[in-house]
Amino acid sequence: MRIVFVHPNYHSGGAEIAGSWPPAWVAYLCGALKKAGYTDYHFIDAMTDYVSHEKLAEKLRELQPDIVATTAITPSIYVAEETLKVAMEVVPNALRVLGGIHATFMFRQVLEEAPWIDVIVRGEGEEVLVNLVKAYEADNFAETRRQVKGLAFLDGDEIVSTAAAPTIRDVDSIDPDWGIINWKNYIYEPLGVRVAIPNMARGCPFTCSFCSQWKFWRDYRVRDPKKVVDEIEKLVNEHGVGFFILADEEPTINRKKFIEFCEEMIARGLPDKVKWGINTRVTDVKRDKELLKFYRKAGLVHISLGTEAAAQLKLDVFNKETTVAENKEAIRLLREADIFTEAQFIVGLDNETKETLEETYRMAWDWQPDLANWSMYTPWPFTPLFQELRDQVEVFDYSKYNFVTPIMKPKALTRGELLDGVMNNYRRFYMKKALFHYPWRGTGFRRRYLLGCLKAFLKAGVGRTFYDLGKAGYWGPQSKDKVDFHFDETRKIGNAQMADWEASADRAAKAAERREALRVQGKARAEERNAAKAEAAPILTAGGGGCGGHADGSDCGCGGKKQQQVDEFHVPMACGGGRQQMAEDEFAMPMACGGGKQQMEEAEERLVRPAE
């Protein structure tokens, strides 16, 4: 069974500024296949190698695979669809498989616009792919595919989605095959060294309304830190990796395991060989302020903070549990620990104005992070915030959903003015940094790293790839009214996808009604219990029982403590700083407290909606 994986040839002016990133997904899938006994797999990185459709066709003809598989995030979905169309034309007997976050949630749309796709893998891919390959090897695949969990496909005119596959419980069993990667192609520009993107955990327990990772991975699972360091040691010693970024949404959530990870890195002497970076939350930085220098000793040199917005209003919209003041304090703490800070700002919401854009610049300069990024709000079509803002979304050309193209149009700005405002922030921030900070502050590694970051920005700017400025035709303030983002206006939401959204909205409304009924019922029962307690209080007091127990003072079984009453419908919910998780059936749905504001909609949806 020969399997060929293809990374789609999609480019934007965002993350590529810092270098070429190795597609970790293929290493993890190949590791699962290898463990299951499938070793005849190949990889074509059409993105890094700029492989055209014609060249891809040649490679597929040469390899003659039994299965061609690719993946897609939202902006690369059309290229991924075209990749499998090429496969259909040159190796028509090969099974064509698509995975990734976009296809997982938008499979109806994808199958409607690209019916040549044979199978979509939904959700976490390792176990689902192995089961799919086994089913494809067996006879009568048209029938056996219906028994494989985590798939979607067309059967005639019917869009079929099988039951959701459970998440991988034993994350320590994950063993990626990094040997599938051609490492000389993946360089981290600021340091000029090979870069990797391993992960320490799967999932995220928070429910930020603009993000979809918590929906895709579902529950939060952390690997054994020693096994993660085993993997990193292999990347360093066998593949020459000199820098890595933990792919986790927030690796510091589990403080104990993150500390163990750092201790293991130090014990093996790895900080002298490899540096690394993470994304994390401001609250975790403040929590661990006494440990930041220890983290730096373990090789952690770069932290990207989701400050998200200068205006507190925006933080509230995004369901962030931080304040503007906390953002500034976290950056100060990291600076004192000699850890490079990168502040992330989201711009382009409906309430954006010239004044709010200017405010983000002023705060960025006041906070003094080493780096600052302004990303366009991108309404992933499968997030809660997209559903709330759907009437305001005018662009459904997903190839532009890349954080650098203004998908949303603020009421007070044109898209060209929004882009110009963002570029004005970049120009001022990095011009000042280049003249007064980077060359003169610090020595050795700090100076080299900052100048390397500046070089990466300049390289992208001169090449007109930064923020896709060349494609948009932006040359400065004088061109803001002439920019063209080349939106494909023929792209619309598919009928099947729209019908599913409407059905989901109806289910959500019914769930909300049930929650309200339960709330009223619970309140009434509480009042009844309180009334009963008040009526019985004199008798119980006279009896002398410590909790209102037996008259002779003997134990009534409650241990002298208030006993919790459990209604028919009881959901365990605790304000643990956003870290409480709730399990329902085979799902473990993360629940974020948001400072006491629990979000139940997703969990309720799991209860009332059959698994697809």
Curated annotation (Swiss-Prot):
This is Anaerobic magnesium-protoporphyrin IX monomethyl ester cyclase. Pathway: Porphyrin-containing compound metabolism; bacteriochlorophyll biosynthesis (light-independent). PANTHER family: ANAEROBIC MAGNESIUM-PROTOPORPHYRIN IX MONOMETHYL ESTER CYCLASE (PTHR43409:SF13), ANAEROBIC MAGNESIUM-PROTOPORPHYRIN IX MONOMETHYL ESTER CYCLASE-RELATED (PTHR43409). The lineage of its organism: Bacteria, Pseudomonadati, Pseudomonadota, Alphaproteobacteria, Rhodobacterales. Binds 1 [4Fe-4S] cluster. It is an enzyme of class 1 (oxidoreductase). Involved in the tetrapyrrole biosynthetic pathways leading to chlorophyll and bacteriochlorophyll (BChl). Catalyzes the anaerobic formation of the isocyclic ring (E-ring) in Mg-protoporphyrin monomethyl ester (MPE) to yield protochlorophyllide a (PChlide a) via a six-electron oxidation and the formation of an oxo group at position C13 using oxygen from a water molecule. Its cofactor is [4Fe-4S] cluster; adenosylcob(III)alamin. GO terms for cellular component: cytosol. InterPro entries: Cobalamin-bd, Elp3/MiaA/NifB-like_rSAM, Methyltransferase_Class_B, rSAM, rSAM_horseshoe, Tetrapyrrole_Bchl_Biosynth_MTs. Residues 190-417 form the Radical SAM core domain. Keywords: 4Fe-4S, Bacteriochlorophyll biosynthesis, Chlorophyll biosynthesis, Cobalamin, Cobalt, Iron, Iron-sulfur, Metal-binding, Oxidoreductase, Photosynthesis, S-adenosyl-L-methionine. Its EC number is 1.21.98.3.
